[in-house]
């Protein structure tokens, strides 16, 4: 479990169990309905939010608002998604291509994309804003969050974070958070997806560690549904899914595989690896090492996004966002 010295995973795990899903080979992660559940979850939520804030405070001190050679970020940041995730050259609306482009290095481009009052007349009720037509900008911002969280290069991480904060100071980045066409594709999804998988993986591992029966991670239905329906999909403006696709695909787990497993398929000839499996071979050892890095990256996405929230939202709104997202994961079970 990640940060088990800070986050009370074992406490909330004592309120859940893994139960067989009828005649299916899958298991459900279900609440036991204990009288202490609400208090335990409330305590966990408060500790989790405080821990995110602790890490984000450290990151905030690393922000440098000076531009790199007149640009928001250097070519090292621009090319990072292709080098790190193996993505193709820039294209929009794709989890297979780099969502960052050279034009995103220019603050004036971001300013020019924001609709202004002059387009609507002189009424003061109108101000510069972004809309659902700007999903590509949301994806570019998601990748700045991801880069600031997962790069092994400190200079690249700081550049990406500083670029995000510069944008927050000069253009209406808050507008990009909740973009939706009935289904969401806004900037906030970069945090939502990372939080969901981070919590599910840690909670499942904590519940497993309490029981005598070892249930494969790849037979827990709630995780399979999360992967197959959301986190591995390549749908409208899916940049938030890029780091998750990279990790799970490395284990042989694709969105179509997860969908079939969630439907109760009993056998598959496709080679997949359970990163929580007990195998002691080189493949499983490497998977466990990569899982630790993945969980660290997911948590880093959370505190980098919290740095961003501090730039554009009130303290109350920021805490409400995290509380809502944490509770939504629990209600998802």
Curated annotation (Swiss-Prot):
Alphabetized UniProt keyword annotations: Virulence
Pathway per the UniProt entry: Mycotoxin biosynthesis
Function per UniProt: Part of the gene cluster that mediates the biosynthesis of gramillins A and B, bicyclic lipopeptides that induce cell death in maize leaves but not in wheat leaves. The nonribosomal peptide synthetase GRA1 incorporates respectively a glutamic adic (Glu), a leucine (Leu), a serine (Ser), a hydroxyglutamine (HOGln), a 2-amino decanoic acid, and 2 cysteins (CysB and CysA). The biosynthesis of 2-amino decanoic acid incorporated in gramillins could be initiated by a fatty acid synthase composed of the alpha and beta subunits FGSG_00036 and FGSG_11656.
Protein name: Gramillins biosynthetic cluster protein FGSG_00039
Species of origin: Gibberella zeae (strain ATCC MYA-4620 / CBS 123657 / FGSC 9075 / NRRL 31084 / PH-1) (Wheat head blight fungus)
Lineage: Eukaryota, Fungi, Dikarya, Ascomycota, Pezizomycotina
């Amino acid at each position: 479990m990640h940060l088990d010295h800070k986050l009370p995973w074992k406490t909330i795990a004592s309120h859940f169990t893994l139960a067989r899903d009828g005649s299916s080979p899958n298991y459900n992660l279900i609440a036991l309905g204990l009288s202490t559940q609400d208090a335990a979850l409330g305590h966990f939520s408060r500790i989790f939010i405080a821990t995110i804030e602790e890490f984000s405070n450290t990151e905030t001190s690393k922000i440098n608002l000076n531009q790199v050679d007149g640009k928001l970020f250097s070519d090292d940041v621009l090319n990072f998604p292709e080098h790190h995730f193996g993505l193709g050259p820039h294209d929009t609306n794709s989890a297979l291509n780099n969502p960052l482009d050279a034009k995103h290095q220019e603050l004036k481009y971001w300013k020019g994309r924001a609709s202004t009052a002059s387009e609507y007349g002189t009424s003061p009720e109108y101000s510069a804003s972004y809309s659902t037509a700007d999903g590509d900008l949301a994806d570019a911002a998601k990748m700045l969050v991801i880069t600031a969280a997962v790069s092994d290069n400190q200079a690249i991480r700081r550049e990406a974070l500083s670029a995000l904060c510069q944008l927050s100071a000069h253009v209406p980045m808050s507008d990009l958070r909740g973009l939706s066409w009935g289904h969401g594709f806004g900037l906030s999804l970069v945090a939502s997806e990372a939080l969901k998988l981070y919590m599910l993986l840690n909670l499942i591992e904590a519940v497993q560690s309490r029981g005598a029966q070892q249930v494969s991670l790849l037979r827990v239905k709630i995780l399979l549904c999360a992967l197959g329906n959301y986190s591995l999909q390549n749908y409208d403006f899916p940049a938030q899914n890029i780091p998750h696709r990279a990790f799970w695909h490395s284990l042989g787990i694709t969105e179509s595989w997860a969908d079939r497993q969630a439907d109760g398929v009993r056998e598959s000839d496709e080679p997949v690896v359970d990163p929580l499996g007990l195998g002691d071979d080189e493949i499983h050892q490497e998977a466990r090492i990569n899982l630790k890095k993945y969980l660290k990256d997911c948590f880093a996405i959370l505190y980098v996004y919290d740095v961003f929230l501090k730039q554009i939202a009130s303290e109350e709104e920021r805490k409400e966002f995290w509380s809502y997202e944490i509770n939504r994961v629990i209600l998802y079970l």
